[in-house]
Regions:
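Ribonuclease/tRNase effector modules and their secretory precursors
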Residues: 1-90
Length: 90
């Protein structure tokens, strides 16, 4: 799935989480991916996916759909409970 993100948001995400939004593209294009709808988001429909980036590192990606593209909102390292959920789910 093609993806896009705001360069300013990328800089903010890098400062906050130490991870670039660029990594989200690799996660969303990985076949071993767990995705749920983020029911806590208000306004637009958002999804949370966990999977491996192109470097083989587990990442959590928050995104919304804009047409045929995934608009990446956030990428971060997973919490221990998210790692377990991924390992049990795939």
């Amino acid at each position: 799935m093609p993806s896009s993100f705001d360069p300013k948001k990328d800089a903010a995400n890098l400062r906050k989480h130490g991870v670039s939004l660029v990594e989200g593209d690799g996660v969303l294009n990985n076949l071993l991916l767990l995705t749920i709808e983020d029911t806590a988001s208000e306004g637009e429909q958002r999804f949370v996916s966990i999977g491996m980036n192109v470097f083989g590192q587990l990442r959590v990606v928050v995104y919304t759909l804009r047409g045929d593209d995934a608009r990446i909102i956030s990428v971060r390292k997973p919490e221990p409970k998210e790692v377990r959920a991924y390992e049990e789910g795939v």
